[in-house]
Amino acid sequence: CDSITIEAGGEAGLFYAFQTLMQLIFPSQKAEKGSVAIPCVKISDSPRYKWRGMHLDVSRHFFQKEFIFRMLDAMAMHKLNTFHWHLTDDQGWRIEIDRYPELAAVAAWRDETLIGHGSETPWVYDGTRYGGYYTKEDVREVVEYAARLHINVVPEIEMPGHAVAALQAYPELSCTGGPVPPFNRWGVSEDVFCAGKEETFEFLEGVLTEVAEMFPYEYIHIGGDECPKVRWEQCPLCQKRRADNNLKDEHELQSYFVKRMEAFLAAKGKKIIGWDEILDGGIAENAAVMSWRGHSGGIQAANMGHDVVMTPHLFVYLDYYQSEYNEPLSIGGMLPLEKVYSID
C-alpha cells in the first residue's frame, strides 16, 4: 500500500475516519520527522449508537473551561458525539443567567465542602468557600469548540429536585419560603422547587429561555431524579395544585411539573431528556429517558416508544472505585474495567 483512501457519508464520518487513521500511527512515531509507516488495512465501520456520550458534573466539583476543552478533545478521539454538561445541582449553580443575577452571585458558591463520605459521621468539612460559574461567553466558546469536533452539547438544568443552590439564591421558590442554606455535603435534600407556586414556573421558564438560546442542540436535560416529596406533601399550595389538576399523588404532581416544562421547551423547538424517574407518575409525551438506576427504566421507556440513553450506574459511572479501596476517594461502589465492558 502506498496511498490512503478515505470514504465517508458526510463530514462527521470523515472526521471519525481521521481519528481511526491517527490511531494507526504508533505513539513512538508521532514525534519523528518525515514519513511514518502504518499497517496496510481496510477498515469499514459505522457508529453502533446514535448517542455516544460523556457526562461531566460541574456542580459538585467545578472544572475550568480549559479542562472541558481537553475533555472534548479526548471525546473526539474516542468518537463520542454528545457532551452532557451537568450545570446545576444542590451543591452549585454553574451557568450565568442575565435575568437572575443571584444565581452567579450566590447560588454558584458554597461555604465549605464535606471531606469524605456522607455515611461517615461525624461530618468533617474543609472550611473553604468553593464555587465558580461559566459566563455566557464561556458557554459560547465550549459549544463552538465542541461543534468543530462534531460533538453536541446537552445542558442539564436540574428540576424539581437537586435545586438547593437555586433556592439558596431565590428561597421564595421553595415550599417553606426559606431561608435555604447552602448544601455543603453529598446526598439528597428535601428542599425542592415548589410545584404549587406559579413563580417557580416563571423562574424556570426564564432560565430555560436563556439556556435554549445558548445551546443549539435539540435536547435540554431537565434532571427529574431523586426528588423527595416531603415538602410537597406538607405544602398547601402543592396540595391545591394536586387537587385542582386531579392528580392522585405527588408522583403525578412531578409528572405535571415535567410536562409543563416539556410544553414550554417544545414551543421553542427543543426536546427534553430526563433521568428515569420521569417515568414515575406518567412520562411526558415526547421526552427521552436517561436510565441511570439500571436497565429496566430504559427498557420500559423504549417499549413505550421513547428514545432512551442507557447510563446504568453500576456499569458506567466513573466516580466509583476501580480496583482497591485504597484508591483516591470515590463516591463508593466497585466498578472494575471488565465490568464496564460487560454491559452488553
Feature names for model-found ranges:
Residues 1-219, 235, 260, 264:
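Feature activates predominantly on carbohydrate-active enzymes
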Residues 56-58, 87-89, 155-159, 224-226, ...:
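A cross-domain feature marking catalytic cores of carbohydrate-active enzymes
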Residues 62-64, 90-96, 160-166, 221, ...:
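Flexible loop/turn segments at secondary-structure boundaries
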Residues 141, 197-219, 226, 240-344:
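Substrate-binding groove of N-acetylhexosamine-processing glycoside hydrolases
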Residues 232, 236-240:
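Conserved, charged catalytic cores of large soluble enzymes
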